[in-house]
Amino acid sequence: MSGRPQAVPTVQVDNAEVIVTEWRFAPGAETGRHRHGHDYVVVPLTDGTLLLETPEGDRHAPLVAGQAYFRKAGVEHNVINASAHEVVFVETEIK
């Protein structure tokens, strides 16, 4: 365990087509290492910076409120809020 606070997921929709989850990250909060089993789209609700810990190395990723991005299934990472404020995004996994 890293000792970081945990990001808070709230599943809003889970049906045969999609899983829609709102993620809230306090400063320094993390998801924990995980692998995505589905393609997914993220829509940031706040600006901020995430630290992505991946098998290929760490990198920072800026978030811009309202600027969506898409990722393919198989992505493996731990997502950490590297901002000094809460970061919120909605993730839609496509089944």
From Swiss-Prot:
<dbReference type="InterPro" id="IPR011051">
    <property type="entry name" value="RmlC_Cupin_sf"/>
</dbReference>
<feature type="domain" description="Cupin type-2">
    <location>
        <begin position="23"/>
        <end position="90"/>
    </location>
</feature>
<dbReference type="Pfam" id="PF07883">
    <property type="entry name" value="Cupin_2"/>
</dbReference>
<dbReference type="InterPro" id="IPR013096">
    <property type="entry name" value="Cupin_2"/>
</dbReference>
<protein>
    <recommendedName>
        <fullName>Beta-alanine degradation protein BauB</fullName>
    </recommendedName>
</protein>
<dbReference type="GO" id="GO:0019483">
    <property type="term" value="P:beta-alanine biosynthetic process"/>
</dbReference>
<comment type="function">
    <text>Involved in the degradation of beta-alanine.</text>
</comment>
<dbReference type="InterPro" id="IPR014710">
    <property type="entry name" value="RmlC-like_jellyroll"/>
</dbReference>
